[in-house]
């Protein structure tokens, strides 16, 4: 039976549960449940702290896990990303008190508070910078005000929390994070149950990022229209009652699809319809 780790709480939890449910897997009905057995799919789900998931997967005790890229890298566990899931996106950056033009080199000799010590140490080592890394389990922004640290390294979203504490982010991003599906590094690729879950989830992720576009198109502009909507492999063309027209169906990315519809309308296409895709096996 396949054993899969899922975040038990936090920003990744609901999105992970939703994507697995859409992929046809059983979801827990009580937030206190630590395990859920799905006998019809031969899968057992374990609900764990997001920070611990990479450790369990890397040890080989669990086959797959959903966690954040930043958490997986910071764990130091021997895991590999099998699939990017497209939710929980964030950036991980250095920040320090505003009022100075900070560079990463300015961190030399300073105290840096973070909840991701390994990620920070690896970055500093790669840059040849020596600094003291202080591990905190949260609310690292207040550490400078309390005199525990001189700078921080943390997940940055809108930047509102940094501004509230008069901090400014600087330097390159240490990690562009999002939810990821991980497995133990070097896992065999011939596990049918594992591959089935991966492909199901891949289909949901693809469906969330694309939609189906249908429109009627005069044959005189068909070549130009197909350049706008090339589809995944090739668009589907169907004859209409009027032999001078054809119906076109093609997948397009959700991002920017309104612009695509505008282009088709300007070109002369009619009855342009966008519809969501629930799931697919597209790749």
From Swiss-Prot:
Cofactor requirements of the protein: Mg(2+)
Primary location group: cytoplasm
Listed GO biological process terms: L-histidine biosynthetic process
Record keywords, A-Z: Amino-acid biosynthesis, ATP-binding, Cytoplasm, Glycosyltransferase, Histidine biosynthesis, Magnesium, Metal-binding, Nucleotide-binding, Transferase
Coiled-coil intervals: none
Highest taxon above the source species: Bacteria
An example molecular function term from Gene Ontology annotations: ATP phosphoribosyltransferase activity
Enzyme Commission designation: 2.4.2.17
Alphabetical list of Pfam families matching this protein: HisG (PF01634), HisG_C (PF08029)
CC per GO annotation: cytoplasm
Subcellular location: Cytoplasm
Pathway named in the protein's UniProt entry: Amino-acid biosynthesis; L-histidine biosynthesis; L-histidine from 5-phospho-alpha-D-ribose 1-diphosphate: step 1/9
Reaction(s) this enzyme catalyzes, per UniProt: 1-(5-phospho-beta-D-ribosyl)-ATP + diphosphate = 5-phospho-alpha-D-ribose 1-diphosphate + ATP
HAMAP family: HisG_Long
Family named by the database record: Belongs to the ATP phosphoribosyltransferase family. Long subfamily.
Function: Catalyzes the condensation of ATP and 5-phosphoribose 1-diphosphate to form N'-(5'-phosphoribosyl)-ATP (PR-ATP). Has a crucial role in the pathway because the rate of histidine biosynthesis seems to be controlled primarily by regulation of HisG enzymatic activity.
NCBIfam families with a match to the protein in the record: hisG, HisG_C-term
Protein name, UniProt field: ATP phosphoribosyltransferase
Underlying gene: hisG
């Amino acid at each position: 039976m396949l054993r899969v780790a899922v975040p038990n709480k936090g920003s990744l939890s609901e999105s992970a549960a939703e994507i697995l449910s859409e992929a046809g897997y059983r979801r827990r009905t009580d937030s206190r449940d630590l395990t859920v057995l799905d006998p019809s799919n031969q899968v057992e789900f374990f609900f764990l702290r997001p920070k611990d998931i990479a450790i369990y997967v890397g040890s080989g005790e669990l086959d797959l896990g959903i966690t954040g890229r930043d958490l997986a890298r910071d764990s130091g566990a021997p895991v590999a990303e099998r699939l990017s899931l497209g939710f929980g996106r964030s950036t991980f950056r250095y920040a320090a008190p505003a009022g100075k033009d900070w560079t990463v080199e300015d961190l030399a000799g300073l105290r840096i508070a973070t909840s991701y010590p390994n990620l920070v140490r690896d970055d500093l080592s790669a840059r040849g910078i020596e600094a003291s890394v202080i591990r905190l389990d949260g609310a690292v922004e207040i550490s400078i005000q309390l005199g525990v640290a001189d700078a921080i390294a943390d997940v940055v979203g809108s930047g509102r929390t940094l501004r509230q504490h008069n901090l400014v982010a600087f330097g390159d991003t240490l990690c562009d994070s999002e939810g990821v599906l991980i497995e133990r590094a070097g896992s065999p690729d011939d596990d049918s149950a594992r591959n089935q879950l991966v492909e199901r989830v891949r289909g949901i992720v693809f469906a969330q990022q694309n939609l189906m576009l249908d429109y009627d198109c005069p044959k005189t502009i068909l070549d130009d229209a197909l350049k706008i909507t090339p589809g995944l492999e090739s668009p589907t063309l169907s004859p209409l009652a009027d032999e001078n027209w054809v119906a076109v169906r093609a997948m397009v990315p959700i991002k920017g699809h309104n612009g695509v519809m505008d282009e088709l309308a300007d070109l002369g296409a009619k009855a342009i319809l966008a519809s969501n895709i629930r799931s697919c096996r597209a790749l």
